[in-house]
């Protein structure tokens, strides 16, 4: 959602969730269907369009250079805004504390932080090559 607008990023992520819940095998392992709503990843599924919206919203509002704006937007939307509903959903489904649920997903945090860094550099490269392809923050 970094190089595209809030509405398009959020809508694309929402469409992905709707198609997945409709049964298309779009998740890892070919998973899809309404049964996902009763599994431990329900919060991440619900949080996916929220994360895309927050990422685009942050990219529009953070008034710094593209690299820094991208890092902040990807961290805020792609990690924080995704992990909050994800951990809450996992805690509820598994009947665990929030801390215990976070412990279950903590192994993924480092990888997601690496993706934040990569995303920032990719967005910066796109901006340098084709500035009109990256979300305007003016």
Predicted region positions:
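Internal catalytic-core helix/loop-beta-alpha segment
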Residues: 43-75
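Central hydrophobic cores of alpha-helical transmembrane segments
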Residues: 11-19, 73-76
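Membrane-embedded alpha-helical hairpins and interfacial helices in multi-pass inner-membrane proteins
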Residues: 62-137
């Amino acid at each position: 959602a970094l190089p595209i607008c809030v509405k398009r990023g959020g809508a694309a992520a929402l469409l992905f969730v709707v198609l997945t819940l409709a049964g298309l095998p779009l998740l890892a392992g070919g998973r899809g269907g309404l049964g996902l709503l009763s599994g431990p990843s329900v919060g991440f599924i619900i949080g996916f369009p929220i994360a895309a919206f927050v990422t685009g919203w942050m990219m529009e509002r953070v008034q710094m250079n593209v690299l820094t704006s991208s890092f902040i937007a990807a961290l805020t939307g792609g990690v924080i805004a995704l992990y909050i509903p994800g951990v809450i959903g996992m805690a509820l489904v598994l009947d665990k504390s929030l801390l215990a649920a976070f412990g279950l997903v903590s192994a993924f945090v480092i990888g997601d932080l690496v993706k934040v860094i990569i995303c920032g550099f990719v967005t910066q490269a796109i901006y340098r090559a084709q500035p009109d392809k990256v979300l305007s923050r003016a």
